[in-house]
Amino acid sequence: YSVKPGQTFKKPAGSLTVTQIINATITKLGKADLPKALNISEKMPKDIVDNTPTKYNPETEALDYWESLEGMRVEVTKPKVTGPQYKGDIYVLPGDYKGQKLNNIGGVNLRPGVQNTEVLPITVGNKFVAKAKDYFNENITGVVTYKNKTYKIDPIDPNALKGLLQDGGLKREVSKIYPSEDKLTIASYNIENFSANNKGHDETPEEKVDKIANSFIKEVHSPDIITLIEVQDNNGGVNDGTVDGVKSGEKLAQRIKSLGGPDYKYTEIAPVDGKDGGKPGANIRVAYLYNPKRVTLIGKEKGGSEEAARFVNGHLEKNPARIDPKSVHFEKVRKSLAAEFEFKGERIVVIANHLKSKLGDD
């Protein structure tokens, strides 16, 4: 788009303004210690976001409170982490805050009509690893800013945060369902943008492959059938028209076997390039791992990318098959995948889903 003299451009709606100083001239008048950072624990308004949009009430309304602190140094007392890092931020609760109780896994429960405005985002970067129940053993000082439609705190010394973080002891849950000769076990597992590509920016690191494979064996006890969510094509986010993801699925299956798990088989139907949403070029899809010593995938012919599943005489005509892939309800989203298996002489149809889960999903 060419810009012409006299044209006016406005900032897109939906974000608040941030105070800026433009073309400033700085004059040094002397030296002084920085003022003490404001400890925010006691004065944070609880639950109310903005009940009176036309009035400024920082004492009672969270939006106005954070606006009053924009650009200021603040201190958070020994923050408690309420969940893992997400898009470079972790969400914390001040360690001395009395107005909110954490649940048994260190998170904050959603309640009707309550916004949990006392949970604070702190900028830590995309490589920072933390989990619920972890905590910092010292106070964190930072500057309040506004980014991506939310107020957050930028730490004064972000490099020091890793050394202050303490393990809260939260362990990944282990399934209480164990294999049984006469019972079929099925699991659904989001493997989070998994591909056979282990090089470059769009890689799936080998450590991640090991972690997921071990999870299948030790935490969910090697289910007979696994519906996989977010299997990428063979080269991940490389946007070159590749849609086949068999190498991605088989890499995971082979790693499970090498670590002592079952010799799973993999099946999928590749999507049409760029039609199922997710990361551009990665073509995520749902797929299946199944243990051929326990179940049989019925039939030999599978459906096509744009071919709808048909149930004929009590069975899938093609197997596996995508459910109504041309429907307007499945535009730019993962198509559900049906698969028919036989277990102990009985047939069962399993449907793998990965539906939209957030407003920003494409």
Regions found by a protein language model. Name each.
Residues Y1-K199, E203-S222, L316-H329, V333-K335:
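Extended non-catalytic accessory segments flanking core domains
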Residues V3-T8, V81, I191-A196, V231-N235, ...:
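Solvent-exposed loop/turn segments at secondary-structure junctions
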Residues T150-K152, K183-I186, D224-I225, D263-K265, ...:
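Beta-sheet entry/capping signal
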Residues L161-G163, E306-A308, S357-G360:
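A short local loop/turn or secondary-structure capping micro-motif enriched for an aromatic residue
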Residues H201-K208, G241, G245, D362:
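Residue-level preference for long, well-ordered alpha-helices that form the structural scaffold
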Residues A213-R322, K326-S327:
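Active-site surface patch of divalent metal-dependent phosphodiester/phosphate bond hydrolases
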